C-alpha cells in the first residue's frame, strides 16, 4: 500500500516529518518498506505556457515554441512531442535544472535553432509509464486546468510529496486504505481523525423506482447495495485526484472510473460503476454462475465460469464477475450518462479462488480476499455519490437499493487493567488504557474493573483479549516500556558494537596509509567556528570562555588540524599526515539540545614518501589525498562519487564534494594558497567526511576478497569532449552501461592543445573487464564496449 503524505494530511494533522512518521509507524507494527520522494533529483521545474508554436525550418518532427515561464521574456524551446501546441500549460525544465537520472538541462542548438529548456513528459520527471494517463503516454503532459506560469510544477502537479510504501502483513487489512492508516496515525500521535464529506444534494426521484436488487445466496453475498447517479459528464478528473492515484500506483482513466478507484483507496471498499443504460434491465440479480456460462470481461477476454464463481447479472446475463472484474458491455464509456454504483460484501474464499484461477488479481480482489469492513460499505458508496456530484456534475437519486444484511459494525471484548498489566509487565492505570483504546477509535464502557471494548469491523485482526493487550503495548510504545534489570545466571564477556568495529577498521586503514591520529579541542575561536562547515547553522558560543581561541563549539575538525600541521612545520617536521574522528556541534535554537555529529577529517602536506627504501620520493597532491579517502570507502563497502565544488578556504580549481547515494557527505581539496601561506604551509590537502552519514549507509565491510582465477581484459578509449565536461560524468556513463563485467576504470591521460578544437579536450580512459565466474571472450567484451561507446556518443563525446 502506497500512502501519500499530502493525501494523509486531509484526514489527520501532525507536526512531524515524514521520515519520523515512517519510523514511528514501523516501530508499532506496520513496516514502512520504502519512502518515495517525488522531489528527489529534480531542480528548476516550473509551469510554462506555450504562447506560440512553429515548425522547425530544418526538421519535420520538431517544433519551435515560445514559452512563458514567468520571466520577463518568453524562452524559446525546441520540442519534438507530437502533442505540443500553442495555448497549453506544460511542464518546463529550465536551463540549469535537473531531472531524474542525472539529466542536466543546458542551452543547446537543435538543427540550428536555439533551445533554452525542455518541455517535459511525466516519464521525464520520474513517473512510471504504467501510471500515466493514456492521452500523455507518447507526448508531453498538458495541464487540464489553467496555471500560473513560473510556479513550481511539482506543486501544481501535487507531486511535491513523499509516499510511504507499507509492507503489510495479512492481518492488517485496515491499513489498505487511507482512512484506516489515518486512524493508525491519529492513535500514534493522540490526535483526531477527520472523515471526508459524504453527503450529497439528492433529487426527489428515488433509486427504488429505477432498480431492484436480489441476492440468491446470502452465504456467498451477505450484502449488496446500489445507488444511482444521473447526467454525469465524462471528462478527465481533477489534477489533484489524478496525482493521488498515480502516487498510489493506479493509472487515471476518467473522472467516473477515477472516483471509483479513489474511494477504493480512501476507504478500502471496492466499488464498481455500471453504465445504467447498458445494463439491459432494471434489475440486478447476484447469483452463482451457471455451469459452462461465459462472459466477456473488461479486458476483452471471454471467460468460462464455474458454479463457484459469483456473478452480477441483469436477471439473465452476467454483467460483472463479482469482486474481480466488470463486464465489457456495461462498462463506463465516453458517452455514459447514468451510473449505478455497486457496494457489496462478497465471500472472501470465493473471490480468492476465482481471481487465482483466472489470474485476475486486482486492487479490488485483494481487499475482498482479506475481508471488508462492514462499517464502510455504504459510507464508501455515499462518498462516491458526493464526488460524482462535485466532479462529474452528477444528479444523485435518493435512497439506496439493497439486499441482505451488513452485519455487526462492532465486536465487544471484555478485559481488565489487571490482565493487561500482568501481560505487559508494568502498570498502567485504567484511565490510561481507556485513553489508548479511544485513540484507536474504539468506544469503551466501564463496569467496575471490566472494560468493554467495542472493536470496529475495520480491525478484523482483533478478536481476543490478547489482541487488545497488543494494541495497548504498541500504541503506548514498545520503546517507552520501562527497562528492568534481568537476573543473569552467568556473565558473558562483552564485545565491540558494529560501529565500534567499523571505526577501528577505519583508523587502521588511515594509519596504514601513513596518517597519524590527532585529538584536538572541541572549542575554537568564534571566527573559526563556521570555517569549512558543511551546514551553515548558528554557532554555539560559551557564555564565559577561558580564552578567545576557545569561545565556540566547532562545526568542523579542520581548523585545529590546520593549526596542528602549522605547529609541526614550524618545528621542522615538514611532512605532516594527520586524521581525526571527533564530534562537531550544530545549534537547534534556544532551549534545544544541539545536534552532535561525528566527523572524519584529515590533512596532508609535504612529502608522502620520504624514505629511500619506500621507493621514489612522492609529494602530496589531490589524487593522493583522494586515494586515502577511497581506501576508507572501500573498507566500508561504500561507493563515493566526486563533484567539482567551490568551498571557502579551499583552492577554487582543486576542490570536490564527496557524494554518497547522491547526497553530499563531505569534501576534499587543496587549502587555498592564501590560507596556506598564512599558516606557513606549502601545498596542503584536506578532507572532511560526515562519519555518522557513512555509518548510517554502511551495511558491511570488506575484510577479504578472493583473487580472481580467470584472466581479465583491458580496453582503452580516447574521447574528445567539451572542456567543461568532468571526467566523472563520462565514468558514470561508462559504469552505467558496463554491466557486471566492467570492474574499474582509470583516466590515464588528459590533453588540450594542438590538433584539438578550441574548448575541446581529449580524455583517455582504460576499462578493465573481468568475470569471476568464467573466462571472458572478445565477443562479449566487444559487445559491452560498443554499448558504452554508443552511450558516450549520445552524451556528446567523439570517439577518437
Swiss-Prot record:
One of its GO terms (cellular component) is phenylalanine-tRNA ligase complex. GO terms for biological process: phenylalanyl-tRNA aminoacylation. Residues 408-483 form the B5 domain. Its cofactor is Mg(2+). It catalyses: tRNA(Phe) + L-phenylalanine + ATP = L-phenylalanyl-tRNA(Phe) + AMP + diphosphate + H(+). Mg(2+) binds at residues 461, 467, 470-471. InterPro entries: aa-tRNA-synth_II/BPL/LPL (IPR045864), B3/B4_tRNA-bd (IPR005146), DNA-bd_dom_put_sf (IPR009061), Fdx_antiC-bd (IPR005121), Fdx_antiC-bd_sf (IPR036690), NA-bd_OB-fold (IPR012340), Phe-tRNA-ligase_IIc_bsu (IPR045060), Phe-tRNA-ligase_IIc_bsu_bact (IPR004532). One of its GO terms (molecular function) is transferase activity. It is found in: Cytoplasm. Residues 708-800 form the FDX-ACB domain. It holds the Pfam family tRNA_bind. SUPFAM superfamilies: Anticodon-binding domain of PheRS, Class II aaRS and biotin synthetases, Nucleic acid-binding proteins, PheT/TilS domain, Putative DNA-binding domain. CDD domains: PheRS_beta_core (cd00769), tRNA_bind_bactPheRS (cd02796). Keywords: Aminoacyl-tRNA synthetase, ATP-binding, Cytoplasm, Ligase, Magnesium, Metal-binding, Nucleotide-binding, Protein biosynthesis, RNA-binding, tRNA-binding. It comes from the Bacteria. Residues 39-154 form the tRNA-binding domain. Its EC number is 6.1.1.20. Binds 2 magnesium ions per tetramer. Belongs to the phenylalanyl-tRNA synthetase beta subunit family. Type 1 subfamily. Tetramer of two alpha and two beta subunits. NCBIfam families: pheT_bact, YtpR. This is Phenylalanine--tRNA ligase beta subunit.
Amino acid at each position: 500500500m502506497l500512502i501519500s503524505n499530502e493525501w494523509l494530511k486531509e484526514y489527520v494533522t501532525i507536526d512531524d516529518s515524514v521520515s519520523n512518521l515512517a519510523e514511528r509507524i514501523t516501530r508499532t507494527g506496520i513496516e514502512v518498506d520504502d519512502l518515495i520522494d517525488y522531489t528527489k533529483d529534480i531542480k528548476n521545474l516550473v509551469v510554462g505556457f506555450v504562447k506560440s508554436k512553429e515548425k522547425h525550418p530544418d526538421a519535420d518532427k520538431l517544433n519551435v515554441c515560445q514559452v512563458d515561464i514567468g520571466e520577463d521574456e518568453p524562452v524559446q524551446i525546441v520540442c519534438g512531442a507530437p502533442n505540443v501546441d500553442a495555448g497549453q500549460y506544460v511542464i518546463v525544465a529550465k536551463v540549469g535544472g535537473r531531472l531524474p537520472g542525472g539529466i542536466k538541462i543546458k542551452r543547446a542548438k537543435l538543427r540550428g535553432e536555439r533551445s533554452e529548456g525542455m518541455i517535459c513528459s511525466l516519464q521525464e520527471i520520474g513517473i512510471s509509464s504504467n501510471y500515466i494517463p493514456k492521452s500523455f503516454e507518447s507526448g508531453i503532459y498538458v495541464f487540464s486546468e489553467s496555471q500560473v506560469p513560473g510556479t513550481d510544477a511539482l506543486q501544481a502537479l501535487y507531486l511535491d510529496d513523499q509516499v510511504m510504501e507499507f509492507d503489510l502483513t495479512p492481518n492488517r487489512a485496515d491499513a489498505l486504505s487511507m482512512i484506516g492508516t489515518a486512524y493508525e496515525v491519529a492513535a500514534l500521535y493522540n490526535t483526531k481523525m477527520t472523515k471526508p464529506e459524504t453527503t450529497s444534494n439528492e433529487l426527489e426521484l428515488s433509486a427504488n423506482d429505477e432498480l431492484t436488487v436480489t441476492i440468491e445466496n446470502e452465504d456467498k453475498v451477505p450484502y449488496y447495495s446500489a445507488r444511482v447517479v444521473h447526467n454525469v459528464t465524462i471528462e478527465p478528473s481533477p489534477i489533484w485526484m489524478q496525482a493521488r492515484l498515480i502516487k498510489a500506483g493506479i493509472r487515471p482513466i476518467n473522472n467516473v472510473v477515477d472516483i471509483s478507484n479513489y474511494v477504493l483507496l480512501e476507504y478500502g471498499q471496492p466499488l464498481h460503476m455500471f453504465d445504467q443504460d447498458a445494463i439491459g434491465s432494471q434489475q440486478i440479480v447476484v447469483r452463482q454462475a451457471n455451469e459452462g456460462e461465459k462472459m466477456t470481461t473488461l479486458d476483452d477476454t471471454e471467460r468460462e465460469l464455474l458454479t463457484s464463481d459469483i456473478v452480477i447479472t441483469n436477471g439473465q446475463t452476467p454483467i460483472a464477475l463479482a469482486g474481480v472484474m466488470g463486464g465489457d458491455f456495461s462498462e463506463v464509456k465516453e458517452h455514459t450518462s447514468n451510473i449505478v454504483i455497486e457496494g457489496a460484501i462478497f465471500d472472501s474464499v470465493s473471490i480468492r479462488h476465482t481471481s487465482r484461477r483466472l489470474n485476475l488479481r486486482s486492487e479490488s480482489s485483494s481487499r475482498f480476499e482479506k475481508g471488508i469492513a462492514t462499517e464502510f460499505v455504504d459510507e464508501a458508496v455515499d462518498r462516491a455519490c458526493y464526488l460524482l456530484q462535485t466532479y462529474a456534475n452528477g444528479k444523485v437519486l435518493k435512497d439506496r437499493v439493497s439486499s441482505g444484511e451488513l452485519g455487526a459494525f462492532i465486536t465487544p471484548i471484555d478485559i481488565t487493567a489487571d490482565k493487561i498489566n500482568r501481560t505487559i509487565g508494568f502498570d498502567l492505570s485504567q484511565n490510561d488504557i481507556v485513553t489508548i483504546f479511544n485513540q484507536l477509535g474504539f468506544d469503551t464502557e466501564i463496569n467496575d474493573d471490566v472494560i468493554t471494548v467495542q472493536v470496529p469491523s475495520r480491525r478484523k485482526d482483533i478478536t481476543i483479549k490478547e489482541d487488545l493487550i497488543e494494541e495497548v503495548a504498541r500504541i503506548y510504545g514498545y520503546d517507552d516500556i520501562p527497562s528492568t534489570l534481568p537476573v543473569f545466571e552467568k556473565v558473558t564477556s562483552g564485545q565491540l558494537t558494529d560501529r565500534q568495529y567499523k571505526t577501528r577498521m577505519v583508523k587502521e586503514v588511515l594509519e596504514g596509509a601513513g596518517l597519524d591520529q590527532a585529538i584536538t579541542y572541541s572549542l575554537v575561536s568564534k571566527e573559526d567556528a563556521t570555517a569549512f562547515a558543511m551546514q551553515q547553522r548558528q554557532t554555539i558560543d560559551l557564555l564565559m570562555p577561558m580564552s578567545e581561541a576557545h569561545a565556540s563549539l566547532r562545526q568542523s575538525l579542520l581548523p585545529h588540524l590546520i593549526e596542528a600541521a602549522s605547529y609541526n612545520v614550524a618545528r621542522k617536521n615538514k611532512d605532516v599526515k594527520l586524521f581525526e574522528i571527533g564530534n562537531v556541534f550544530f545549534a537547534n535554537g534556544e532551549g534545544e539540545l544541539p545536534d552532535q555529529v561525528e566527523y572524519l577529517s584529515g590533512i596532508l602536506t609535504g612529502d608522502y614518501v620520504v624514505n629511500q627504501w619506500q621507493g621514489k620520493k612522492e609529494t602530496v597532491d589531490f589524487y593522493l589525498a583522494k586515494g586515502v579517502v577511497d581506501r576508507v570507502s572501500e573498507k566500508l563497502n561504500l561507493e563515493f562519487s566526486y563533484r567539482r565544488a567551490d568551498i571557502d578556504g579551499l583552492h577554487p580549481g582543486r576542490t570536490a564534494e564527496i557524494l554518497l547515494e547522491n547526497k553530499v557527505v563531505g569534501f576534499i581539496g587543496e587549502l587555498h594558497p592564501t590560507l596556506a601561506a598564512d599558516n606557513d604551509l606549502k601545498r596542503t590537502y584536506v578532507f572532511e567526511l560526515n562519519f555518522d552519514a557513512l555509518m548510517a549507509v554502511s551495511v558491511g565491510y570488506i575484510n577479504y576478497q578472493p583473487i580472481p582465477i580467470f584472466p581479465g581484459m583491458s580496453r582503452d578509449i580516447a574521447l574528445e569532449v567539451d572542456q567543461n565536461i568532468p571526467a566523472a560524468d563520462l565514468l558514470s556513463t561508462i559504469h552505467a552501461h558496463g554491466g557486471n563485467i566492467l570492474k574499474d576504470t582509470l583516466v590515464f591521460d588528459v590533453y588540450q592543445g594542438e590538433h584539438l578544437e578550441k574548448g575541446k579536450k581529449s580524455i583517455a580512459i582504460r576499462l578493465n573487464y573481468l568475470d569471476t565466474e568464467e573466462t571472458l571472450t572478445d565477443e562479449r567484451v566487444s559487445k559491452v564496449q560498443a554499448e558504452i561507446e554508443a552511450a558516450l556518443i549520445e552524451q556528446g563525446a567523439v570517439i577518437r
